[in-house]
Design a protein with these regions (language model features):
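Short loop/turn motifs that connect adjacent beta-strands in outer-membrane beta-barrel proteins
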Residues: 21-23, 146-152, 174-181, 205-211, ...
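Periplasmic polypeptide-binding modules associated with outer-membrane biogenesis and secretion
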Residues: 7-143, 154-158, 163-172, 185-186, ...
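Outer-membrane beta-barrel translocator domains and adjoining extracellular loop/strand segments
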Residues: 139, 165-169, 194-200, 212-215, ...
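Feature captures outer-membrane beta-barrel proteins of Gram-negative bacteria and organelles
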Residues: 137-145, 164-177, 195-207, 212-214, ...
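C-terminal transmembrane beta-barrel domains of outer membrane proteins
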Residues: 8, 323-528
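Transmembrane beta-strand segments that form the barrel wall of outer-membrane beta-barrel proteins
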Residues: 69, 120-130, 137-160, 168, ...
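Transmembrane beta-barrel wall of Gram-negative outer-membrane proteins
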Residues: 171-275, 279
Length: 528
């Protein structure tokens, strides 16, 4: 494990956690050391700018990190828990880097030191993006680590192709002194409003024995329908949803975790003609779902640590173990549903590492849900991703995904276009009951690190795909579509917000009048 100088240990006992576990060592003192964004002792980060940023930032409180740890004083050393703790800490966007090391070992007891380095968490949003021919802008302020407590508070004003308005949100992942998550969101837009509230104590680790969840949302909006990238129909959609569930698990046994949950989904969807808006399709039908459910989950504990895959020069974890989740529900007319129906959802994923070091990830899904026609809809599909490193700073990436729906109406069709992965075309350019999309990229990860703030990378890409079948096909350009392009990737890895800026030039290879010869896309993503 490699860390910046500020995270490197001056000395360490000769044994690693694996050897300590085999020796039966017990954890003594656990020390948490939370550090500021920049290491002022590093000559590359010792300037006035870095010192000013550190002074403006409030460092994460040690107890925030301590409550995330899966081990404590008196426990026997477990390499699995050490590794999983590192994975959990790296998922916290308020953390830039993590080191967990044995600090001292004597008489069968080992002291452990956990060192973290913060990210900049105050987001003064003033952003613009263009993707699929659509512009999106945002202005606001969001603090993801208020006073170092892990509390996230934000206000934003956004505008995109569908709506504009303001939102406030609050989120806290350590409520009641533990691991309970609380989140609240309230938005007011030119086409309606949205409110949601969530209380969730999840299965936060592979060995967690119980989980409880309750969520509520209420939304009023205008839903658009597009054909050939053009807006052709709009209607008002009001929806209310409630979910409650509780889960049980025996924990991690022999490298596998099994979980069983029970709960209920309640959902009301209502549709209305909106005055002044064109409606060229049949209005969707109101429907209600009242569905008790059972959910089963199976997870294999297999992760690998990599670098220069989905991010630039940052430690990542890829899950290569088998994961299965199956949920079966019965929507009951006797509980207030529009009609009694069996509903289900299943998802399975797995990963393989080849002798060459290349990694293949696969996923398959199937779902039966109530569609906008108030009748059942079945959707199934698969996705495969290949990561093929060429060197420490370059990687070939390929993905292919295919899915199909049977049942439902125009509002339930599968979409394909610029914001759906086909970068050379307008957003929602094709729609249909069947969809296939393949993306190929050659990624470059440079060592250039301007101002110790921005990691720089690039990509050349080729996309090909098609959506077809159903009542809302693109009859103008409904065949296979493809594009080629190049892009710059700027990873702001010292910040807690959307980390990777994508600057792409994409050229569609099958154009019709109205489609630009070159699409310029600007957007922020969490990954490469």
């Amino acid at each position: 494990m490699s860390f910046p100088p500020a995270l490197a240990a001056e000395s360490a006992p000769p044994l690693g956690f694996g050897e300590l576990e085999k020796s039966g060592a017990v954890i003594g003192e656990v020390r948490v050391d939370t550090r500021n964004i920049f290491d002022l002792g590093n000559p590359a980060e010792s300037g006035l700018f870095y010192g000013t940023v550190n002074r403006l930032h409030i460092v994460t409180r040690p107890e925030v990190i301590a409550r995330t740890l899966l081990f404590k004083s008196g426990d026997r050393v477990s390499l699995q828990k050490i590794d999983e703790t590192e994975r959990l800490l790296r998922t916290l966007r308020i953390i830039h880097d993590v080191e967990i090391r044995p600090a001292a070992f004597e008489d069968g007891k080992v002291d452990i030191e956990v060192t973290t380095r913060d990210t900049w968490t105050l987001d003064l949003t003033g952003s613009y993006s263009r993707s699929g021919g659509n512009d999106k802008s945002a202005f606001g302020v969001k603090e993801r680590n208020l006073l170092g407590t892990g509390l996230s508070v934000g206000y934003s004003r956004t505008s995109d192709a569908d709506r504009s308005g303001t939102e406030i949100d609050l989120a806290y992942g350590q409520a009641f002194g533990g691991r309970t998550q609380i989140a609240f969101n309230r938005g007011r837009f030119d086409d309606g409003a949205r409110t949601s509230f969530l209380v969730d104590r999840p299965f936060y680790s592979l060995d967690t024995r119980g989980a409880v969840r309750g969520g509520w949302s209420n939304e009023d909006r205008i839903d658009p329908i597009y054909n050939s990238g053009e807006l052709v129909s709009e209607f008002r959609h009001r929806l209310k949803a409630i979910e409650v569930s509780a889960g049980w698990s025996a924990g991690l046994v022999g490298g596998w975790t099994r979980r069983l949950s029970a709960g209920a989904d309640l959902r009301d969807d209502a549709y209305r003609v909106e005055p002044g808006r064109a409606l060229t399709i049949a209005l969707p039908l109101d429907h209600r779902v009242r569905a008790p459910f059972l959910r089963y989950e199976l997870l294999e504990d297999e992760f690998v640590k990599v670098k220069n895959y989905r991010n630039i020069a940052r430690t990542e974890f890829l899950g290569l173990g088998f994961h299965l989740q199956v949920q079966v529900a019965r929507s009951l007319e006797g509980l207030g549903a529009t009609r009694s129906e069996w509903l289900y959802a299943a998802e399975a994923s797995d990963g393989i590492t080849f002798e060459s070091g290349h990694k293949l990830l696969g996923q398959a899904t199937v779902e039966r849900r109530v569609a906008s026609t108030a009748t059942p809809l079945t959707q199934g599909g698969f996705a495969v991703q290949l990561y093929a490193p060429r060197s420490t700073d370059s990687l070939s990436y390929a993905s292919i995904a295919a899915d199909r729906v049977r049942g439902g109406g125009v509002a339930d069709q599968l979409l394909l276009g610029g914001t759906q992965g086909l970068r050379g075309y307008p957003s929602r350019y094709q729609a249909g009951e069947n969809r296939v999309l393949a993306n190929f990229e050659q990624r470059l990860y440079s060592d250039w690190y301007p101002f110790r703030l921005i990691r720089v990378g690039g990509a050349a890409f080729f996309d090909i795909g098609r959506a077809w079948g159903g009542p809302n096909q693109n009859l103008v350009n409904g065949g296979w579509l493809s594009d080629v392009g190049v892009g710059l990737r700027l990873a702001f890895d010292r910040t807690a917000f959307a980390n990777v800026l994508h600057l792409d030039l994409a050229m569609p290879l099958r154009r019709t009048p109205g489609i630009k010869a070159v699409q310029f896309l600007v957007k922020t993503e969490l990954t490469f």
